[in-house]
């Protein structure tokens, strides 16, 4: 599948703070107030660990972030010190939904996980999103348990 004309899938850039990155992420969940300084600090942390953090975005022809996603690669002792990919923070701007950007994002992050030698990729989702992730090639692999603080 290809992106619509004018759209680009790429790694997150520091300048995306000013290109609607946080606003797009807010479609998914509560983000809170994140200053440019806070964003820069987190971006630099992610950039210092490129084998672990793989933040990606989809931008429109104007360079505005319209979809977000993160692949986090966890190094394990099991599976001969194998790696597991975790897909997180999939969010598509409301005005861009229905264009298969989420599908493109998830399948592209899955490929990034394969390229990073992950033996599997996992993600958590709400029950109403199960059908979407099944279309992306995922299947029910268990139950997510949470302890929030």
UniProtKB/Swiss-Prot annotation:
Molecular function GO labels: glucosamine 6-phosphate N-acetyltransferase activity
Catalytic activity of the protein: D-glucosamine 6-phosphate + acetyl-CoA = N-acetyl-D-glucosamine 6-phosphate + CoA + H(+)
Residues reported in the UniProt entry to bind substrate: 29, 76-79, 88-90, 119-120, 124, 148
Source species: Candida albicans
Transmembrane segments: none
Biological process (GO), any one: UDP-N-acetylglucosamine biosynthetic process
CDD domains to which the protein is assigned, alphabetical: NAT_SF (cd04301)
UniProt: acetyl-CoA binding residues: 90-92, 98-103, 133-135
Alphabetized InterPro entries for the sequence: Acyl_CoA_acyltransferase (IPR016181), GNAT_dom (IPR000182), GNPNAT1-like (IPR039143)
Family: Belongs to the acetyltransferase family. GNA1 subfamily.
Keywords from the UniProt entry: Acyltransferase, Transferase
Pathway terms, separated by semicolons: Nucleotide-sugar biosynthesis; UDP-N-acetyl-alpha-D-glucosamine biosynthesis; N-acetyl-alpha-D-glucosamine 1-phosphate from alpha-D-glucosamine 6-phosphate (route I): step 1/2
Protein name (database record): Glucosamine 6-phosphate N-acetyltransferase
EC number: 2.3.1.4
PANTHER family: GLUCOSAMINE 6-PHOSPHATE N-ACETYLTRANSFERASE (PTHR13355:SF11)
The N-acetyltransferase domain, residue ranges: 7-149
